Amino acid sequence: MPLQPFKTSNLLTMGVELELQLISLSNFDLTAASPDILELLGRSSFPGSFTPEITESMLEIATDVHEEYEQLLKQLFHIRDTLVAVGDRLNIGICGGGTHPFQMWSDQRIFNKTRFIEVSELYGYLTKQFTIFGQHIHIGCEDGNQALFLLHSLNRYIPHFIALSASSPFVQSKDTLYNSARLNSVFAFPLSGRAPFVLNWDEFSLGYFEKMEHTGIVKSMKDFYWDLRPKPEFGTIEMRVCDSPLTVERAAALACYMQALCSYLLENKEPLPHEDDYLVYNYNRFQACRFGLDGTLVHPKTYEQILLREDILTTLRRLKPYANQLNSTMALEHIYEITHKGSDASFLREKYAEHRTLESVVNESLKQFRSSK
C-alpha cells in the first residue's frame, strides 16, 4: 500500500503525546491497570485523547493541535487533573519518568490489541522491555519537502531534547549512570535510529518507503522507531527522543522549544542539512543519554567540541525573538531553568540520596505529576 500523501498542516502548530506510568499505591511498582482506567475514561468526556500502550501498565494521552504555549499548557493541566481524578477512584497512581526505577520487564503483560500482539510475536522479550515512557512532539508542516528539511535540520539538536527531558536514570533497581537509559531500549529495535537522508517527499515516498514496503519489513510509518519521523497523515514531523517529564509544564516547554527551533531553521539561519551531518550523530546522542547536560558534543559542520549545556544556552539566546513571536517566552524560561537547576534525572537521583529507597523515588514522581501548577 503506497504511503499516503502528506497532509497540509498549519505551519508550526504543535501537539504532545505522553506515555505515563500506572502505579500501585500499595508497593509503588507498575500495575496492569490500563484496561480499567481506559474503561473509566471512556465513560465521560476527556480533554484530549487516550489510548493503550504496548503493556498494560502504560497509558498514552495526546493533546489537540495548538498554536501557542498557554493553550497547550492549559489542556495538559486539564488532562492531568482528569487522569489524577480517575486514578484516585481506582487507587492507582499516575506519573511521568522515562523508566520505572525497579519494575521487572518479565512481569509486564501485553495489552490485548492485534498490533501489540504482532509486535510481541516478532520481537519477543524486547516487547516487554519496551515498557518505557516517552514524550512525542508533533510540529505542523505545510508539505512533505518542508517536513524532511526540518527533520534533517533538527538532527544536531536531538541531544538538547534528550538531555533536557532526561528522567530515566534507574532500571531494574540499579542506577545505570545514564541520564536517559530509556533510549537504550529503543535502540535495540532494528528500525530505530535516524531517518534516511532524503529531502524530497516523492523520493522518500516512492523511492525509499515503497522499497521498504516491498521487502515485507514495514507496512506503515508506525513500523519505524526513528528519533524523528514524518507523519503524513497528520501533516507533521514527530520527535520521539524525549523521556516523559515528571511535570506537564516541562512537557509543554519542550514542545515550544522545538516549535521555536523550527521557526528559526525555516529562516535558513544555518547551513543546509547534509548526509555527513550524521557522522557524529550517534556519538552526540550517546553523550546526551549518558551525561545529560554535562555531555560534550561534536558540531556536525565544524567538528568543534562543544559543551551541551553551553550549546543549549547559546541556542536559547538565538531563539528569543522567535519565542516572542510565538508567545512562548515563558516556555523557554523553563528550558533555561533546566540548564541551571538540572534535569528530572538529577531530581530523581537527589531523592534517592535523600530517602535511600526506590519506592520513595516513585512516590516523589507521583507528587511531582499531580501537584505541579
Swiss-Prot record:
GO terms for molecular function: ATP binding; glutamate-cysteine ligase activity. Keywords: ATP-binding, Ligase, Nucleotide-binding. Signal peptide: none annotated. It is an enzyme of class 6 (ligase). Its EC number is 6.3.2.2. GO terms for biological process: modified amino acid biosynthetic process. It holds the Pfam family GCS2. NCBIfam families: gshA_cyan_rel (TIGR02050), PRK13516.1 (NF010040). Belongs to the glutamate--cysteine ligase type 2 family. YbdK subfamily. This is Putative glutamate--cysteine ligase 2-1.
